[in-house]
Structures are given as structure tokens and as C-alpha cells.
From Swiss-Prot:
Pfam families associated with the record: YcgL
Name of this chain's protein: YcgL domain-containing protein APL_0712
Disulfide cysteine pairs (residue numbers): none
The organism's place on the tree of life at top rank: Bacteria
InterPro entries (UniProt xref): YcgL-like_sf (IPR038068), YcgL_dom (IPR027354)
Stored HAMAP family: UPF0745
Ranges in coiled-coil conformation: none
Domain YcgL span(s) in chain numbering: 6-90
Length: 97
């Protein structure tokens, strides 16, 4: 039994930590809008990833990434929202007052 592979190339942004760009083929950015390319900066290659493999992405669903690449030619993963340190502190110290 053979499983089809859907490899994608993953790049990180030098301008925004935690922002990643997924494209169908390595070094092919034709489908990425120019404005996004400018905002993203010069893509830094991270790895090739099999979207049909057993491994799952940490912050995005493999199926969503694959669908976006097939329909628009790329997938942009935004950085996670910043942690609210005050809220975390208050929750941890709730009963200590």
C-alpha cells in the first residue's frame, strides 16, 4: 500500500518570529503576493514536510495547509498571540492574597 506524498517547503520570516510560509515547491514564490513577500522578508528555508505523512504540524492542521496550497498556492502561518503575563500572574496568585 502506498500513500501519496504532498511535500511542501516551509520558510520562516526574518522579520517576524513565529511567522512561517508554506509553498508547494522549494524556492517557488510566484503565487505569493508581492505585498506579502515584502512584509515577510527574505524567506529562510526550514525544511520539506510531507503533509500526508503521520507527523502533524504543531500550530496548523496539515489538511488546512494542503488545501490552502492547492487553492491559493501558499499558506501563511501567523505567530501565536503574545502571552498575557498579567492574566497569567493573577491566575497563579489568585488564592494567595
Amino acid at each position: 500500500m502506498t500513500m501519496s506524498t504532498n511535500l511542501c517547503a516551509i520558510y520562516k520570516s526574518p522579520k517576524r518570529e513565529g511567522m512561517f510560509l508554506y509553498v508547494a515547491k522549494r524556492d517557488q514564490f510566484d503565487s505569493v503576493p508581492e505585498a506579502l513577500r515584502q512584509m515577510f522578508g527574505k524567506p529562510q528555508f526550514v525544511m520539506l514536510f510531507n503533509l500526508n505523512g503521520e507527523k502533524q504540524l504543531k500550530r496548523s492542521k496539515n489538511e488546512e495547509v494542503l488545501q490552502a496550497i492547492q487553492t491559493q498556492g501558499f499558506f501563511l502561518q501567523m505567530p501565536p498571540p503574545p502571552e498575557n503575563l498579567l492574566k497569567t500572574f493573577l491566575e497563579q496568585n489568585r488564592g494567595e492574597a
